Swiss-Prot record:
Membrane topology summary: Multi-pass membrane protein
GO BP annotations, alphabetical order: carboxylic acid transport
Keyword annotations: Cell inner membrane, Cell membrane, Membrane, Transmembrane, Transmembrane helix, Transport
GO cellular component, one term: plasma membrane
Known function: Forms an efflux pump with AaeA. Could function as a metabolic relief valve, allowing to eliminate certain compounds when they accumulate to high levels in the cell. Substrates are p-hydroxybenzoic acid (pHBA), 6-hydroxy-2-naphthoic and 2-hydroxycinnamate.
Any GO molecular function: transmembrane transporter activity
Record's protein name: p-hydroxybenzoic acid efflux pump subunit AaeB
Gene name of the encoded protein: aaeB
Induction statement: Positively coregulated with aaeA and aaeX by AaeR.
UniProt similarity note: Belongs to the aromatic acid exporter ArAE (TC 2.A.85) family.
Periplasmic side: 1-12, 59-68, 114-120, 173-369, 428-430, 480-481
Length: 655
């Protein structure tokens, strides 16, 4: 496909984006808004931003959800801006500096919350800054400006949603159904690989792919939940399927690890059974029926616990899968599965990374303020706004530097494009609303196609072009003002990029170490006799951390294997029949406290000391288990855990 070619699948969204822009423009001028540009810009960003993130036409509900987040972020930002202005109106410089800190604070929060919700916090940060900067000449008009900005943004969002509904958005339901079938086949094939006990790298690749696919399925569930309330039953089932899929991965990998020391546990009966190849979900269904008969014939005691647990989880997965596809009423058997254990939320491992993002945003905004005050440039305020926008939105993404480059390319492309609209097109179409709408629709259509291709600079060009062309009421054409705005955008993006380069993010290794220690803490916390604690479902949170580790350290197999081993240890110890008595319960609490100290330690020396203490406590704990005559189901996994921690103690403690 050529660089300027138009694929059929891109046309519908391009028309949708053009419609959203035209609707926002028409409504803005019809209701005599002072700056219809904000409504048009909001409609374009909400629609195009979702498509850029999806790499194509977004699924149904995605634009609506992003618009909802934008409304929340705008209202939080407006309220914060009003509070800052009321409190510090007599000290303008201090007021702007506090706004810079507020933008950094919002970026810090957005780095810690779920990535889907981070958009609202990033927006709240720079909205307050926009209000404070814009009202500098006339501070008494602050409430009016805040209300107008909120109104224009809500109009833009409503227009984007209307355009999305008008062109029948894609439903993700069929994709979910297909992925459920395919994922079950992949789970069976992983178990086959693990029972064969072949090449470790092949097994690593297989389970790594399944972790990514299960995480992607969880993302699809979020999209389906946003799409319509009629998928509420499917959403409940998919939430349980996520845990079941992770359980299948864990049991398969434990089957592989067990054979490293005790290959005789997997009998020839099961080896021969899993030799049969499967291609479709129907093949898996037949094999599972046969496997349940084999287990009933051999007996539960003669069946390896990992295979028995795997079959139970696969059977539940199959039952819920049928319910998701048909979206029928939840029956009693399904309800029993869905009334599972409560999921545990873990503390973010990216706190240091979040603090780096805070300083990047705060320092870049302060640098913009100093540049504005030093030069006295009329568009210094525009440069400040772009600095806040770039740093607030870029920091949460995996590669902030590339986001800043995208904005630089976009603002550079917006200069000639905006010049064409400012000097030629808009002056010749302002007498006709129809011609003005057509001219902006053409802009939205072609940039909408490029946005779906994730063309570098396309998203920045769309937003920057709309921002600098005259879409005010009434329209005024001052070339110096246009040029100042265009150059202000470019300078702001360059300054933001400079700060991102200068303030290095060296938090990757620290985040990796914290993640690994959180896996250790989870495995230690599984050693408990507390019934409520044993019922807690840590699996989704643990695999979410594993997925983050895989993204932070692509290709680092030793780290992935260590993390997976800790997850397996957690699951095995969680189900182990630990003797119930006060002596062991008190020691469990002591080990949990020590594991927490390992995570929270700020220096390598403290971390090594607490980790050494944890290893000593594990030795004492094993002795206590022997005294209390704990069965092998308890002593063996504890011994394996202690051995793993001894082996990898340097990786878990040293910076």
């Amino acid at each position: 496909m050529g660089i300027f070619s138009i694929a059929n699948q891109h046309i519908r969204f391009a028309v949708k984006l053009a419609t959203a822009i035209v609707l926002a423009l028409f409504v803005g001028f019809h209701f005599q808004l002072e700056t219809p540009r904000w409504a048009v810009l909001t409609a374009a960003i909400v629609a195009a931003g979702t498509a850029f993130a999806a790499g194509g036409e977004p699924y149904s509900g995605a634009i609506r959800y992003r618009g909802f987040l934008r409304i929340i972020g705008t209202f939080i930002g407006c309220i914060a801006g009003l509070v800052i202005i009321i409190a510090m109106i007599r000290a303008p410089l201090l007021m702007i500096l506090v706004c810079c800190i507020w933008a950094g604070f919002c970026t810090w929060i957005s780095s810690l919350v779920r990535i889907e919700n981070s958009y609202a916090w990033g927006l709240a940060g720079y909205t307050a800054l926009i209000i404070v900067i814009t009202i500098q000449p006339e501070p008494l008009l602050t409430p009016q400006f805040a209300v107008e900005r909120c109104s224009e943004i809500v109009i833009g969002i409503v227009c984007a949603i209307m355009a999305d509904l008008l062109f029948s958005p894609r439903s993700i339901k069929q994709e979910v159904d297909r992925e459920l079938e395919s994922l079950l086949v992949a789970q069976y094939q992983l178990m086959q690989l693990c029972i064969k006990h072949g090449d470790g790298e092949v097994v690593d690749k297989a389970w790594g792919d399944l972790v990514r696919r299960t995480t992607a399925l969880q993302g699809m569930r979020s999209n389906l939940n946003m799409e319509s309330s009629r998928w509420a039953r499917a959403n409940r089932r998919l939430k349980a399927i996520n845990t079941l899929s992770l359980t299948l991965i864990t049991q398969s990998c434990e089957t592989y690890l067990i054979q490293n020391t005790r290959p005789e546990l997997i009998t020839d009966t099961f080896r021969e059974f899993f030799d049969t190849p499967v291609e479709t979900a129907q093949d898996v269904h037949k094999q599972l029926k046969r496997l349940r008969r084999v287990i009933a014939w051999t007996g539960e005691r003669e069946t390896p616990v990992t295979i028995y647990s795997w079959v139970a989880a696969a059977t539940r997965y199959q039952l819920l899968k049928r319910g998701v596809i048909s979206n029928t009423k939840i029956n009693a058997t399904e309800e029993e599965i869905l009334q599972g254990e409560p999921e545990v939320k873990v503390e973010s491992a990216e706190r240091h990374h979040a603090m780096v993002n805070f300083w990047r945003t705060t320092l870049s905004c302060i640098l913009g303020t100093l540049f504005w005050l030093w030069t006295g440039w009329t568009s210094g305020s525009g440069a400040m706004v772009m600095i806040a926008v770039v740093t607030s939105l870029a920091m949460r993404l995996p590669n902030p530097r590339m986001v800043a480059i995208d904005f630089i390319y976009g603002t550079l492309a917006a200069l000639p494009l905006g010049l064409l609209y400012f000097l030629v097109i808009i002056p010749n179409t302002q007498q006709s609303m129809l011609l003005l709408c057509i001219s902006l629709a053409v802009l939205g259509f072609f940039l909408g196609i490029e946005v779906q291709k994730r063309r570098l600079g396309s998203m920045g060009a769309l937003a920057s072009t709309i921002n600098i062309i005259v879409l005010d009421n009434p329209m005024t054409f001052h070339f110096s003002q246009f040029l100042d705005s265009a150059l202000g955008q470019i300078v702001g993006c360059v300054l933001a990029f400079t700060v991102i380069l200068l303030v290095r993010d060296k938090s990757r290794d620290r985040t990796g170490r914290v993640l690994l220690n959180q896996f250790v803490s989870a495995a230690v916390s599984a050693m408990t006799t507390n019934v409520a604690r044993r019922k807690e479902n840590h699996l989704p949170a643990l695999y979410q951390q594993l997925f983050l580790l895989m993204n932070k350290f692509p290709g680092d197999l030793p780290k992935f294997r260590l993390a997976l081993t800790m997850i397996i240890a957690h699951q095995r110890l969680r189900d182990a029949p630990i003797p119930v008595n006060e002596d062991l319960s008190a020691f469990h609490r002591q080990m949990r406290r020590t594991a927490d100290h390992v995570i929270s330690a700020r220096s390598d020396d403290k971390r090594r000391r607490y980790f050494g203490q944890l290893l000593e406590e594990l030795e004492i704990y094993q002795e206590k288990l022997r005294i209390w005559q704990a069965p092998p189901q308890v002593t063996e996994p504890v011994n394996r855990l202690a051995g793993m921690l001894h082996k990898y103690q340097h990786a878990l403690t040293d910076s």
